[in-house]
Every structure is written in structure tokens, then in C-alpha cells.
A protein has these predicted regions:
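Active-site loop immediately N-terminal to the catalytic Tyr-X3-Lys motif
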Residues: 34, 81-87
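Active-site-adjacent segment of SDR/Rossmann-fold oxidoreductases
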Residues: 81, 102-113
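Substrate-binding pocket helix/loop in short-chain dehydrogenase/reductase
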Residues: 32-33, 40-42
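The beta1-alpha1 cofactor-binding region of Rossmann-like NAD(H)/NADP(H)-dependent oxidoreductases
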Residues: 1-6, 38
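Residue(s) in the substrate-gating loop at a strand-loop-helix junction
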Residues: 76
Length: 183
């Protein structure tokens, strides 16, 4: 049993149901695509795509059985628009967008499971250390010098907004970014 499956089993045992999954998985070791850092690519796909799939797979039997639930996928603005050095990362976050839409089509009306894809821009977390340690460090630091980023609480508040919407509706996508983020 995986850690995710164990967590779902413990939650089911304690509460008898799973109402919400916040599916947040991400790593971003940025590098130019021509560097061919294939092990980094594989790791990003494993964490950013397969990690999300494992979360879905773990809660799905419970949500299907109870005829309700809400899966919140934490994607990225990069899933809409790649950036230099982040091509593979952007591809993984585009996969999260595609999964979200597909889940909505398969699980929404037929099974009462809502799906929301939240796509944050820059959030002040350790995720960006992968960029800051790579060949883009100086450009990244200069681009963000003196600028405000989202706080993790901003993303949490966005999740709360989505999951507290009326049961008859679904907030399908939310793009949130700092005011200081141009793209």
C-alpha cells in the first residue's frame, strides 16, 4: 500500500468518507531543453503527473461509492504558457489541465464529483529553488527583485473558495497570479 493509499484508508476509517482531495504535486528543476537533462524530465513527470494520478486513484473508489466529492488539482500558470527553461515543467502542468478537464467530463454529472483546476502564478515556496540553483538563477532573481509573490495562504484561500461553492455548480478553473507577475 502506498503512502497515499494509507492516508486515504486512515481518513476513511476516521471519518467514513472523503469529501475533498487537494492534489498538489510539483517539482521544477529548470534547464534549457538542449541540455537534455533526461533524469530531471523523468522525475518531473513522475512527481507532477504520476503523483497526481496516484492521488486520484486513491480517492476515486470512495468518492464513486458515496456519489460525491471534490478533486482540486493544483496546476500552474505554466500549464498555459511555458517559460524558458521550464518547457518540461509546463508540459507536466498542461497534463494536469488535461486531466482536470477529462475528470470533469467523466466524473461530473455522471457521478457527482466536482473537479477544479487552480493555476497559480508565482507563489513564495521552495518550488522555485530548482530554478534559482540552475542556469537561470541570475535572470530569475533579477526579474523578481522587489516584486510581490503569492503566499501559500492565497492559494489555500482559492481552494476554499472553490470547495465552498454551491453543490449544483463547479468552479472548473481558477487562474491566480501576483499583481506583479506580467505573464
Amino acid at each position: 500500500m502506498s503512502d497515499v493509499e494509507a492516508l486515504v484508508a486512515a481518513t476513511n476509517k476516521e471519518f467514513g468518507r472523503i469529501d475533498i482531495l487537494v492534489n498538489n504535486a510539483g517539482t521544477m528543476p529548470a534547464s534549457p531543453i538542449i541540455d537534455r537533462r533526461i533524469s530531471d524530465w523523468k522525475h518531473m513527470v513522475d512527481v507532477n503527473v504520476n503523483g497526481v494520478l496516484h492521488g486520484i486513484g486513491a480517492v476515486l473508489p470512495t468518492m464513486l461509492g458515496q456519489g460525491s466529492g471534490h478533486i482540486v488539482m493544483i496546476g500552474s500558470i505554466a500549464g498555459r504558457r511555458p517559460f524558458p527553461g521550464g518547457t518540461v515543467y509546463a508540459a507536466t502542468k498542461f497534463a494536469v489541465r488535461a486531466l482536470s478537464w477529462g475528470l470533469h467530463l467523466e466524473l461530473g454529472a455522471a457521478h457527482g464529483i466536482r473537479v477544479t483546476d487552480i493555476q497559480p502564478g508565482q507563489v513564495a515556496t521552495e518550488l522555485y529553488e530548482g530554478v534559482r540553483q540552475g542556469p537561470y538563477k541570475d535572470a530569475w532573481d533579477k526579474a523578481w527583485e522587489g516584486k510581490r509573490r503569492l503566499k501559500p495562504q492565497d492559494v489555500a484561500d482559492t481552494v476554499l473558495f472553490a470547495v465552498t461553492s454551491p453543490e449544483h455548480m463547479v468552479v472548473s478553473e481558477l487562474l491566480v497570479r501576483p499583481l506583479d507577475q506580467a505573464n
